[in-house]
Amino acid sequence: MYQSLMTVRETQIAIKEVKTFFEDQLAKRLELFRVSAPLFVTKKSGLNDHLNGVERPIEFDMLHSGEELEIVHSLAKWKRFALHEYGYEAGEGLYTNMNAIRRDEELDATHSIYVDQWDWEKIVQKEWRTVDYLQKTVLTIYGIFKDLEDHLFEKYPFLGKYLPEEIVFVTSQELEDKYPELTPKDREHAIAKEHGAVFIIGIGDALRSGEKHDGRAADYDDWKLNGDILFWHPVLQSSFELSSMGIRVDSKSXDEQLTKTGEDFKREYDFHKGILEDVLPLTIGGGIGQSRMCMYFLRKAHIGEVQSSVWPDDLREACKKENIHLF
């Protein structure tokens, strides 16, 4: 039977410890400035993140003008637009405390309709748009995760230490070649269990089998230059995604990806015109789940143990039987 290592009160204190340490180090090591973020954007701007392309945003109209607005899914596009508007230069970046609602999320131990993450974005030069630069950035972020685990171990030694010294890089195609008989999700479990920490490169495009490792919107990540950070979760005994990130599309890759997904209508949106006409800066960015981070480092079995959300009665009952106490 699962037993949380902390009381609810102790957990709340530790959550602040996790978030404060990580935010401070993320800003310092990636040279990011914190900015205020929107909870909603106009529909016509095209700034909302449409994730895998099928999730429905929450829509409402504004009394004053009748304009249609959308609650954000993430700030993947907004951040790039903001870097342009605020006059940032190559090597400079921003981050924000992003809160979102994803109404179509399938609820389970690691997914909630409420999303909280550190959303960050940084301007890059054309020659930086390489797998090597992507990997260097991943190593920087992984270094923060390692130091966070050490920091928490000093305060809460009973949490233990599980992260390996190094994170392993693997492409989604290499994973398919290694585990052709497994589903993409099971491949993630296998590789994360083997190494403890992995970064899967290249998500969104079709593999040689014709299947995708996972879906990605066509208009923010370059599918050849993106990926996910996965850890092996010691309590759940499964792979556990901490971050999705990548070098963003330039005019060439955006044009190709919009054509592949049959979304040519998006070319008329302000954001997409900015990419296709080389107005918006080239960037790298990502989202790092705050509740996911707390769930991993505080060794929790359910995301509802580290965030306040709404859960169906049957799910709450099931958790109660497993000795999992949701906020």
UniProtKB/Swiss-Prot annotation:
What GO biological process term is on the record, naming one? L-asparagine biosynthetic process
The Swiss-Prot or TrEMBL record annotates one GO molecular function as: ATP binding
User: What Gene3D superfamilies is this protein classified in?
Assistant: Bira Bifunctional Protein, Domain 2 (3.30.930.10)
Domain of life of the organism encoding this protein = Bacteria
CDD domains (alphabetical) = AsnA
Show the GO cellular component annotation of the record.
cytosol
Kindly list the places in or outside the cell where this protein is found, as annotated in its UniProt entry: Cytoplasm
Recorded coiled-coil stretches = none
This protein's pathway reads: Amino-acid biosynthesis; L-asparagine biosynthesis; L-asparagine from L-aspartate (ammonia route): step 1/1
Q: Which reaction does it catalyse?
A: L-aspartate + NH4(+) + ATP = L-asparagine + AMP + diphosphate + H(+)
Q: What class of enzyme is it?
A: ligase
Q: Which UniProt keywords apply?
A: Amino-acid biosynthesis, Asparagine biosynthesis, ATP-binding, Cytoplasm, Ligase, Nucleotide-binding
Write down the EC number.
6.3.1.1
The entry assigns this protein to a family as follows:
Belongs to the class-II aminoacyl-tRNA synthetase family. AsnA subfamily.
Question: Matching HAMAP family, A to Z?
Answer: AsnA
Listed name of the protein: Aspartate--ammonia ligase
